[in-house]
Amino acid sequence: MHIIKTIKVLYKEIKILKKSNKKIGLVPTMGNLHDGHIKLILLAKKYSDIIIVSIFINPMQFDNLSDLKNYPKTFMKDSIILKKYHVDILFFPHINEIYPNGIEHQTFVEVIKLSKILEGQSRPGHFRGVTTIITKLFNFIQPDFAFFGEKDYQQLLIIKILVKELNYMIKIISLPTIRLKNGLALSSRNNYLSSQENEIAPYLYKIIKKTCEKIIKEDDNIRPKIIHESKILLIKKGFSVDIFDIYDYKNLEHPSKKVKKVILLASVWLGNTRLIDNKKIILNY
């Protein structure tokens, strides 16, 4: 595995790969790798000749400085994992390499509408940070494919819009959420959970599933009552609820009666840890 820390060296390597017509797959990460990342790498291998994984803890997408400071930095462990799965290139840049003039003077990229709602409303500037670093990585690496998990569904949708509207010739491929046996979605933030919170956390997806089952069975006018009861149940379990509702699968607007494909999005706090999850459903009208 070739570990690259500068854009200059990365450009040279990409130029060589492009000349040899190698298909490049990019898996962007912030490190602290788990089985979800590994599944993304394995998926990338099905499409790509060359696998590039980036590890960059992007300060631009953190709305909380203490969250940034406490984010796990596990480069040695991560690099061992990446070597084990035969990743070709690990791009591991320093912050000054990505933002040489500082974040406050950084030109940014933003998918305006979708970045301002839901998670974007709760975390101002977060998605601007995501789309700016993803744009930079796309420009540096020029991948044929880029791979993202579906757990961060709003982020996935934003990146798809970014690719379409900026005319990137990149295929975005998504991976269904990887879960523990108890249903908890894998996330680097799960490390923040206490032992007691780890016992409570799986209830989020259990309640999501039950809610979806009820929504499919019941009439449309009963839906607000179902959502409300599920929120109350989450609160009783110890969660603080930020987002818990169904949205149009394509644009995250509240669905009209004609929309059948919807997604239940959940964003909650458990102690000091933010957990997000979702489930797609097809409504019967």
Curated annotation (Swiss-Prot):
Q: Quick one: signal sequence residues?
A: none
The entry's ATP-binding residues are 30-37, 149-152, 178, 186-189
The question of whether Nucleotide-binding is a record keyword is answered with yes
- The main location class comes to cytoplasm
* Residue numbers annotated as active site: H37 (proton donor)
| Catalyzed reactions | (R)-pantoate + beta-alanine + ATP = (R)-pantothenate + AMP + diphosphate + H(+)
> Keywords, A to Z?
ATP-binding, Cytoplasm, Ligase, Nucleotide-binding, Pantothenate biosynthesis
EC number(s)? 6.3.2.1
Binding residues for (R)-pantoate, per the UniProt record?
A: Q61, Q155
- GO BP term, pick one: pantothenate biosynthetic process
Positions contributing to beta-alanine binding: Q61
- The answer on whether this UniProt entry bears the keyword Nucleotide-binding reads yes
Its localization reads: Cytoplasm
Gene3D superfamilies per the UniProt record, alphabetical: HUPs (3.40.50.620), Pantoate-beta-alanine ligase, C-terminal domain (3.30.1300.10)
Q: Which GO terms describe its cellular component?
A: cytosol
Gene Ontology terms, MF aspect: ATP binding; pantoate-beta-alanine ligase activity
Which residues form each disulfide bond in the chain?
none
Please give the pathway this protein is involved in. Cofactor biosynthesis; (R)-pantothenate biosynthesis; (R)-pantothenate from (R)-pantoate and beta-alanine: step 1/1
Q: Miscellaneous notes for this chain?
A: The reaction proceeds by a bi uni uni bi ping pong mechanism.
Q: What does this protein do?
A: Catalyzes the condensation of pantoate with beta-alanine in an ATP-dependent reaction via a pantoyl-adenylate intermediate.
Q: How does it assemble?
A: Homodimer.
Protein family (similarity comment): Belongs to the pantothenate synthetase family.
Which PANTHER family does the UniProt record give? CYTIDYLATE KINASE/PANTOATE-BETA-ALANINE LIGASE, PANTOATE--BETA-ALANINE LIGASE
What's this protein's name?
Pantothenate synthetase
